[in-house]
């Protein structure tokens, strides 16, 4: 684990807090006492979006319109600008970001906004071998109303690499986290699965982890070389609804998924 791998936690009225990777898996679910559950009703609403470093207009209105009712917002390429931090801390109990690399003004990386305080937080980074830029991932755990713990993996996969070795290597520590968690799981983000070998590596990983893929009927996901880049995988939950929002506010379209707790239908 590199020494510059950490998460920044943003909570309203508090200074930003730096969180280092936990020392062991034993702390999953024990790092902090479980507070209020992520959702008090029977649904868990999730928004997944590569926000393109907020470079386009309307990104905030999309978040306000579609993110405010979500229990989890999983962003990739999120820059911690004052506007985004203000939205996050105003509408969510916690926002955790893993800076992949520091831009001149604000760090950019994956960011998870949540309606509950995480009881576990593990930041991960992997460097792209060609551009030498890092991509980040974040593993967080939240209490559910039925006392189970939900693991959430927010990932932006490496993009430029020869072969799939580095791509698969980024998934390895995530697999270690999942292997030590017995409860439900949501793994989502921009997987940059633009080639057949990458798709094969991703599906093989999902299969090994017993994760199912969320299917979108009107599939308007961003594609590269004819293949979608953004995915949502899950375990130990039911998919109630899944849709893709078409917008010009980013070069990716947001994914909206509504889960219900409980064992998935066969």
UniProtKB/Swiss-Prot annotation:
Protein's cellular compartments: Cytoplasm
Any one GO molecular-function label of the UniProt entry: catalytic activity
Listed name of the protein: UPF0294 protein Ent638_0743
Family the UniProt entry places it in: Belongs to the UPF0294 family.
Keywords in alphabetical order: Cytoplasm
Species of the source: Enterobacter sp. (strain 638)
Listed SUPFAM superfamilies: DNase I-like
GO-annotated cellular components: cytoplasm
Pfam families given in the database record: Exo_endo_phos
InterPro entries, A to Z: Endo/exonu/phosph_ase_sf, Endo/exonuclease/phosphatase, UPF0294
Keyword Cytoplasm: yes
């Amino acid at each position: 684990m590199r020494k510059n791998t950490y998460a920044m936690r943003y909570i309203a009225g508090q200074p930003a807090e730096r969180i280092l990777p936990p020392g062991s898996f034993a702390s999953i679910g024990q790092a902090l006492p479980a507070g209020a559950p992520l959702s008090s009703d029977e649904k868990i609403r999730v928004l997944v979006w590569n926000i393109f470093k907020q470079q386009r207009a309307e990104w905030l209105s999309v978040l306000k319109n579609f993110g405010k009712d979500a229990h989890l917002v999983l962003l990739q390429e999120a820059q911690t600008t004052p506007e985004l931090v203000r939205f996050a801390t105003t509408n969510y109990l916690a926002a955790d970001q893993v800076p992949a690399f520091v831009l001149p003004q604000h760090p950019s990386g994956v960011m998870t906004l949540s309606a509950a305080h995480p009881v576990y937080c593990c930041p991960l980074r992997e460097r792209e071998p060609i551009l030498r830029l890092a991509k980040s991932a974040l593993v967080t755990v939240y209490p559910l109303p039925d006392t189970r713990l939900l693991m959430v993996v927010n990932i932006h996969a490496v993009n430029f690499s020869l072969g799939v070795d580095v791509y698969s290597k980024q998934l390895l520590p995530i697999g270690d986290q999942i292997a030590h968690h017995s409860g439900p799981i949501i793994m989502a983000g921009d997987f940059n699965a633009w080639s057949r070998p990458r798709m094969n590596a991703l599906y093989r990983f999902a299969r090994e982890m017993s994760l199912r893929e969320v299917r979108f009927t009107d599939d308007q996901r961003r594609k590269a070389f004819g293949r979608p880049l953004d995915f949502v995988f899950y375990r130990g939950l039911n998919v109630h609804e899944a849709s893709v929002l078409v917008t010009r506010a980013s070069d990716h379209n947001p994914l909206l998924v509504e889960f219900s707790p409980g064992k998935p239908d066969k």
